[in-house]
């Protein structure tokens, strides 16, 4: 039944409807078949584990060990071997420090930095001539160029040799890709995909889909590894479909398209978002909760941006700050439904976490949601007053209204014993890695959505604030913002390397949040206006299994 309300003039926007309808509502659970597959997966996992452990014992095999770890990670099955990989890379780090003696220094550098080991980039100074230019011989090794290119994305501020290496490798690879279009189209396409999105910004499950057929074509591929990747992908896809069915039933119960028709109906895309943050089976409950939070955060965004009146939003903001069902009577009808929906998902998760003795973790998530709503209210106030904030004012609020500080805290809920009260408190202080992730989210969103938002009453975007304050063109601002985004990625890398008091799995959630933005907002707002690329991603991850 639809919720009725009085007629009020509103700054309504008509968003495209969902492209999925009820496609994911029903899940066909084939438990018997899955049990057989799980048994095979367990056997294959033991085979690969033996390969990992045996490679540790022979120093001359350390380059091959890195290549094995790289393949495991790119095939999307590293979650099976977290302890073994950590042990192997710690051994390599302890053995060599910054003085790597093996082949493939770019691979060594990237793999260790990805895992949180701060190895020096000085090794790449050997790639340059005395005049500072890169050696011509590097251009003859396409695989080496690609490895160096991928390694540059693990750089931090002040690593000029890697800044130079990125420019050099990109220039070389663009030419090579163009030259190979007709003679080797497969390699040309692979290079173009790498140039479009480097490994460090690519979601693990999407990379697995891309890499599995390539790995299969390698003459030296490990058959156990390949089979584990394929079977494991499909097994996880089944779990993810089951989760999405649960989230779909919850969304169907809210009936957002009818009860809150002004809002974007993007539940499936929100689940994809959560899947980008963590795909591993042990985070199933956390993923379901996060998908629901992102879905409602999208509705909240549209309520503040595109529908609610200023007075309604003030009342709703107060209700969220009080966080009590007794506040529901003070709200207009349509906001009662939304308010109840928000409270319900936190109550549900509180009950689940209570069984683990961690119900209090929800208090941190609630606090971050309250702050998130306060930032929306500040932007609504600016829009209501026609006030254009300074760039600094705007970003201080917009970092929070991006939703990423809230999501960074929320995504820790349900991750198990690795998450402590100290970790939540750390997240709420907005440490540099979370600030950098917020910057990426806000700047990428504003770059691609500001033109549409100018068509209605809306707070000035960060682009507009910057243009007005510094009297510069939009083109200039976009260059500045893209540079800020790249700097934010460097800050993320630095923090993942220097913060040893926060477990790497928690750091990875923040990194993954930034990766999702790069997928959804790389060239346009692919979340609001769902294009073929995102539809293909969702179908490949959640509809079509990999042929065995």
Swiss-Prot record:
Cofactor: Mg(2+); Mn(2+)
Amino-acid positions noted as binding Mg(2+) 1 in the UniProt annotation, renumbered to this chain: 301, 305
Major enzyme class: lyase
Pfam families recorded: Terpene_synth, Terpene_synth_C
EC number(s) from the headed UniProt entry: 4.2.3.57
UniProt remark on cofactor binding: Binds 3 Mg(2+) or Mn(2+) ions per subunit.
Catalytic activity: (2E,6E)-farnesyl diphosphate = (-)-(E)-beta-caryophyllene + diphosphate
Known tissue expression: Highly expressed in stem epidermis, cortex and stele. Detected in leaves, petioles and inflorescences, but not in roots.
Keywords, alphabetical: Lyase, Magnesium, Manganese, Metal-binding
Protein task: Sesquiterpene synthase involved in the biosynthesis of beta-caryophyllene, a sesquiterpene with anti-inflammatory and anti-carcinogenic activities. Can use farnesyl diphosphate and (+)-chrysanthemyl diphosphate as substrates, but not geranylgeranyl diphosphate. Produces two irregular monoterpenes, yomogi alcohol and artemisia alcohol from (+)-chrysanthemyl diphosphate. Limited activity with geranyl diphosphate, leading to the production of limonene, terpinolene, beta-pinene, gamma-terpinene, alpha-terpinene and other minor products.
Domains (record comment): The Asp-Asp-Xaa-Xaa-Asp/Glu (DDXXD/E) motif is important for the catalytic activity, presumably through binding to Mg(2+).
Subunit relationships: Monomer.
Protein's name in the database: Beta-caryophyllene synthase
Source taxonomy: Eukaryota, Viridiplantae, Streptophyta, Embryophyta, Tracheophyta
Gene: QHS1
